């Protein structure tokens, strides 16, 4: 059995495989591999529910930091960490970023995108909720999403100013004062 390997350059990971690229008509075991960074893996994961709905057995590769999240979110898929994968485990392969080409061919197809496709750890949520309540304090939560990619990062990052309306309650003096400290 051949074992596929990945290029070491994180910005340009490539799969060395003898297996053909997955096509929508294929009825095969599909290996979806991650060729980009963590943020892209999360973004393109929105396509996984549609891919699973096609009925193909799925081997989904992810960054180790996403493994537990993906196991909860996509229980029908077999989840594997980045690294070498035996070709005997799949018939076709596709980089996760290429799924958009197949599943989002036009603007209307974005309406099919599922909301809430990632499933939080409910036990951890309850644990955190109990801890926050036990402190008796109010907590401020910060949000940051930025990309370090010099080519596409600026168009895929959110400056705090764009989030103000969603984050600040106009009638809440505390949120107003917290925001003033950072803007």
Model region roles, listed by residue range:
Residues 1-183:
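Catalytic machinery of carbohydrate-active enzymes
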């Amino acid at each position: 059995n051949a074992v596929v390997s990945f290029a070491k350059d994180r910005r340009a990971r490539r799969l060395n495989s003898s297996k053909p690229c997955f096509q929508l008509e294929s009825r095969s075991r599909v290996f979806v591999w991650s060729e980009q960074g963590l943020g892209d893996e999360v973004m393109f994961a929105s396509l996984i529910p549609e891919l699973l709905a096609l009925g193909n057995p799925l081997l989904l590769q992810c960054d180790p930091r996403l493994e537990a999240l993906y196991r909860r979110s996509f229980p029908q898929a077999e989840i594997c960490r980045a690294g070498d994968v035996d070709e005997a485990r799949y018939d076709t392969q596709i980089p996760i970023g290429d799924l958009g080409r197949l599943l989002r061919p036009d603007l209307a197809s974005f309406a099919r995108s599922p909301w809430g496709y990632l499933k939080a750890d409910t036990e951890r949520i309850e644990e955190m909720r109990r801890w926050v309540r036990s402190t008796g304090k109010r907590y401020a939560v910060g949000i940051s999403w930025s990309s370090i990619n010099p080519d596409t990062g600026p168009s895929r990052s959110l400056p705090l100013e764009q989030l103000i309306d969603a984050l600040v309650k106009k009638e809440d003096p505390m949120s107003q004062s917290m925001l003033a400290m950072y803007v």
